[in-house]
Regions:
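Generic "edge-of-domain/loop-turn" microfeature
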Residues: 15-17, 35, 44-46, 57, ...
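Short Pro-Gly-centered beta-turn/loop motif in secreted/extracellular proteins
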Residues: 22-44, 97-120
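Structured interaction patches on ligand/partner-binding surfaces of diverse proteins
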Residues: 42-64, 117-142
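Extended non-catalytic domains of envelope/secretory-pathway proteins
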Residues: 6-8, 14, 21-23, 27-44, ...
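Short, solvent-exposed S/T- and G/P-enriched segments that are highly enriched in secreted/extracellular
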Residues: 14-28, 87-103, 126
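A short, amphipathic beta-strand motif
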Residues: 1-2, 66-74
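Hydrophobic beta-strand residues in large extracellular and virion-surface proteins
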Residues: 8-10, 35-37, 50, 60, ...
Length: 142
């Protein structure tokens, strides 16, 4: 399971102070009230106003991840972006000295912008769009 070490940060509604860091499959009792959750997936999932009722189990569900297998031919400058609502949200810069990555990611549309470390002009910049699907692997090679 890609999420066996997944953590969830639990906070009282509207507060930034961490109340508890819960393991993904752990059952935990909370006082009746509303909570905000930050699920430490990639990219992160933020859920607000989760209601906890007395004598009731509240289950949080979200899509299973996919896996990105990424390969660069050599040292490169590259960044990963999430495509959402016709906008790009920066997620990660890749280490220019690493050429292979395996990243567990939430389903969605993404883009990688890449340029070889030896290319000195922006005309040599490459861009690849791809989709991560739940339960599937996506291979991207530059």
């Amino acid at each position: 399971n890609e999420y066996e070490d997944l953590k969830i940060i639990v906070r009282k509604k509207g507060e930034m102070k961490t109340l508890y860091v819960q393991d993904f499959n752990e059952k935990q009792k909370y006082l009746v009230g509303e909570y905000d959750l930050e699920i430490l997936t990639f990219p992160r999932i933020n859920l607000s106003d989760i209601k906890i009722s007395q004598s009731h189990t509240t289950t949080i569900q979200f899509q299973n991840p996919g896996v990105l297998n990424l390969s660069f031919p050599g040292s490169a400058y590259a960044s990963l972006y999430l495509e959402k609502d016709n906008e790009l949200k920066w997620l990660k810069d890749f280490n220019p000295n690493l050429t292979r990555y395996k990243i567990v990611m939430q389903p969605g549309r993404y883009r990688i912008i890449y340029r070889s470390i030896n290319a000195k002009k922006s005309i040599y910049t490459e861009e690849k769009r791809f989709e991560i699907k739940s339960g599937a692997s996506t291979n991207i090679n530059f």
